[in-house]
Amino acid sequence: MVNLRPSAPLSRLLLGYAPSDARTRQALWWHWDERLAAILQGGREPAIMAIRLAWWRDVLVQGDEGKGRGEPLVDALRKPGLTDFDRQYIGRCVEGWGQIAGAEALSAEDLQAYAQGRGGGLFSLLAGQSSPAIVAAGGIWALWDLAAHLSDPELAAVCLAVAQDLLPDAQLGRSTVERPLRLALMVAAHDVQQQRIPIRGFGPRHYVRLLLASLTR
């Protein structure tokens, strides 16, 4: 059986806080985000990245049933039926990743567009709804996650600075479906507030932060 759960430690832990009726779908969205990230991580030519990102848009947004059939993740996402809401925010995720795919230099504006697209789109899909707070929270998480994977410390610092500007807008609601998002935000926001680059990604101190946040959020 194909494993369609995410591999990143934080997203795997967050699934434990998701409502049981939303957990499977949230796992698929986290896994899908990892698949998009993998497109950018192989040092490929920008044109190849663009083609592979466009494939996901064609399959999931444009509804090209001739593509993707038999691909386990595509089949799993299509099985319950993709709504207009899903397609809208899938498109935003793809556009967000496209903002940084193959870019030689990234401006604060590029990072803002990436954050709103990838992070805002993903968090909206995870919650099954969207709001300015959900988009801001997703943007903070996406910039924090990007900073953890950059070899350029100066660009990573810019990511955290852009994320800091989003903090006032990231006031998430108290619904159970948003709980994993609140916890992800708490983990990322702590580093963002301190402008501390998560050099090794999710580590022991983040795990402690997640546990503490889970007691109150």
Region roles according to the model:
Residues G96-S107:
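Acidic/His metal-coordination segments adjacent to aromatic residues that form catalytic metal sites
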Residues M1-W55, G66-D75, Y89-G96, L111-R217:
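Catalytic cores of Mg2+-dependent Asp-rich isoprenoid enzymes
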Residues P80-R87, G91:
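Portal/gating segments that form or line small-molecule/metal binding sites
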Residues L60-E65, F85, A101:
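Short alpha-helix boundary/capping elements
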